[in-house]
Amino acid sequence: MTSGRVDRPAVERDWRARGFSCGLWTDPPDQVWADFRHGTDELVMVVDGEIELEVEDQRRRPAPGEEVLIPAGARHTVRNVGGSTAHWLYGYRR
């Protein structure tokens, strides 16, 4: 599940087997979620659209299907940098 169309049920099964929750987030263009920190690891995967993740001052634009781990306690920001609505999966370690 590294590129192309995202099989959400398969991702959810995989994440749950690894101890993570799995939810779907929807962001309009230009939405910014700035400077968050969580007490647990978080996984993020773009379903469609274009987001930029900034984790501890390192920026990246993951492709749809690319999994990104945000370590517990890491400061992070999510931006919808595309011109359309972005959908992305997120999960927290349980």
Predicted regions span which residues?
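Conserved short histidine dyad/triad with adjacent acidic residue
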Residues: 8, 21-38
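Short histidine-centered beta-strand/loop micro-motifs
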Residues: 12-14, 32-38, 79-81
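Short, conserved beta-strand element in jelly-roll/cupin
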Residues: 27, 37-53
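Structural motif
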Residues: 43, 50-52, 59, 75, ...
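Short acidic-glycine-tyrosine-enriched beta hairpin
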Residues: 57-72
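Ligand-binding loop in jelly-roll beta-barrel domains
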Residues: 72-94
